[in-house]
A protein has these predicted regions:
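Short, well-structured N-terminal submotif of metal-dependent ribonuclease cores
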Residues: 2-73, 80-96, 188
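Active-site neighborhoods of divalent-metal-dependent phosphate/nucleic-acid chemistry enzymes
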Residues: 2-14, 20-26, 112-166
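A residue-level structural signature of the nucleotidyltransferase/glycosyltransferase Rossmann-like core
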Residues: 34, 66, 128, 166-167
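Acidic active-site catalytic centers that drive phospho-/nucleotidyl reactions
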Residues: 38-40, 152, 171
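Hydrophobic/aromatic ligand-binding patch that stacks against planar heteroaromatic rings
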Residues: 59, 158, 174
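Mobile, glycine- and charge-enriched loop segments
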Residues: 59-67, 71-75, 80-85, 93, ...
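Short loop/helix-cap segments at secondary-structure boundaries that form the rim of catalytic
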Residues: 173-180
Length: 188
């Protein structure tokens, strides 16, 4: 599901840091902003662990904010929701839940709630953004500068390419990356 992109009139991200080494409260994102959204925000909202994340996604759904979710974050969300459902069913152990589930394809085939949750996610109307080779190269450059792991760097590479003025995440490592205005839920 894709929406219309940010205006070509938006200014490019500056090369100098716009934010300090900490995040701003998620509720402070200004109306009309284009926001790259990390998986953890989606999970906290889905699991109702953060009313601030729920309210943030409601702002995106209403069109007040323009939420962008890079495809790797969508894949992470699917994976996380599968594991959450399997845990709720008491089908997997906590030690290595992904391995436990991968060894039981019969259980994977029986999972169903995560699909409904993904359909609800897509119905919000967030822009799902595919990534290309240039994004991967940019993510590697970001990794060299910041020490972030791959998917975190991909989130920032997409945010930079799309000129998103904000990044929504609960990840403190991302909040320390320079050159990005990072917003985090204050209720976690």
């Amino acid at each position: 599901m894709t929406g219309s992109g940010p205006s070509t009139k938006k200014p490019a991200l500056p090369s100098k840091p716009r934010s300090g080494p900490s995040a701003v409260p998620l509720r402070s994102v200004r109306g009309g902003a284009w926001v790259a959204i990390d998986t953890n925000i989606l999970i906290y909202a889905n699991q109702r662990r953060s009313p601030e994340c729920v309210a943030f996604l409601e702002r995106c759904a209403s069109g007040e904010l323009q939420g962008v979710v890079p495809l790797p974050m969508v894949a992470e969300l699917v994976h996380a929701l599968m594991l959450i459902e399997a845990r709720e069913n008491n089908w997997i152990e906590r030690a290595n839940p992904a391995r436990s589930l991968s060894e039981r394809p019969d259980l994977v085939r029986r999972l169903s709630r995560y699909e409904a949750r993904m359909r609800e996610f897509f119905a919000i109307g967030l822009r799902i953004e595919a990534l290309g080779a240039a994004d991967v190269i940019e993510a590697i450059r970001i990794q060299r500068e910041t020490g972030l792991l791959t998917n975190d760097a991909l989130l920032l590479a997409a945010a930079r390419r799309l000129n998103c003025e904000a990044v929504a995440t609960a990840d403190k490592a991302i909040a320390r990356a320079s050159g990005f205005k990072v917003y985090a839920p204050a209720d976690l």
